[in-house]
Amino acid sequence: MERIIMHIDLDAFFASVEQRDNPKLKGKPVIVGGTSGRGVVATASYEARKYGVHSAMPVFMARKKCPYGIYVASRHDRYREVSKNIFKIFYEITEVVEPVSIDEAYLDITNCGKEPLKVVDYIKKEIWKRERLTASIGISYNKFLAKLASDWNKPNGIKIIKKDMIPDILLPLSINKVHGMGKKSVKKMNNIGVFKIEDMYKLPLDLFIEYFGKFGLEIYEKIRGIDNREVEVGRERKSIGNETTLRKDTKDIEEIKKYLYSFSKSISKGLRKNHMWGKTVTVKIKNYKFEITTKSKTLKEYINEEEKIYIEACKILDSINIKDPLRLIGLTLSNLSEIKIEQLTIEQLMNSQRS
């Protein structure tokens, strides 16, 4: 049986919540994420996107493109509350749900016993009825094509991609539409005269392996409409972390460590709340030139205590040669486990074998 995979993307989610909660913002260019000019755009409303504003753009650039935009601070607790209510709708349809982020999910509706378009109609109506928000939905026989379809008719769109539509749909597209093709990969392809999937389609498999390594086969198959990835139910959280843009650029290590301490406290709180521990500590810095450096350390034991997280973060920071003033600092704990796995010493191991 051919799978029926659905990708649901809530439209300009953070900005849409702000516009819904404050009717005065309706129809206006709303930019969520930073109000100081030193932050980064989390989400821009569709009205703001017309000016070229997009997520991950520095706020100072957004202000140049959209000087009359309305800049709103993020309210993550509010967004999580709304997201939770919407995800309940997905679970009413099927248990095979893979949350990708707070505003995005895959559903496998192959065995739910309902017509795909009726499922789409129900989901859209319920999201609007319960939260007065819209979503764009893509349907296909695999995850790659379902996501591609959900991007097709934004906002509030629906698109179905069937097997017999693949040549007409895929071949004319730019190669940056292929999930997994980052800026560097696109540039590599552009340098050899490959700009569209149609150009890429003509390349032999060994060239994909040469250019993309272990991802070569995956990309080769995707542009042929092949993607065997399953919808991952209950996908485990892989990391927890925080980052922030500093109020002003600084090389003051003690000032930077204050941020690491604050992050360590919030990370520890989140881990303990979910009864989790982590093993890999990563510090991320961005200087005033927007150059990013990340450095990680995998520990011998799992930790979730704020003091231990902070100590390891400081060790990593001290090992980085910081030449220029920083504008951003981040801290992440990954390699998570719901059980604190202890590393036994040889003596402990011998004792356990004797008992």
Annotated model-derived regions:
Residues 1-211, 216-217, 339-355:
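Gly/Gly-Pro- and Ser/Thr-rich, intrinsically disordered tail segments characteristic of DNA damage-repair
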Residues 7, 190-328, 335-354:
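DNA-contacting surface of Y-family translesion DNA polymerases
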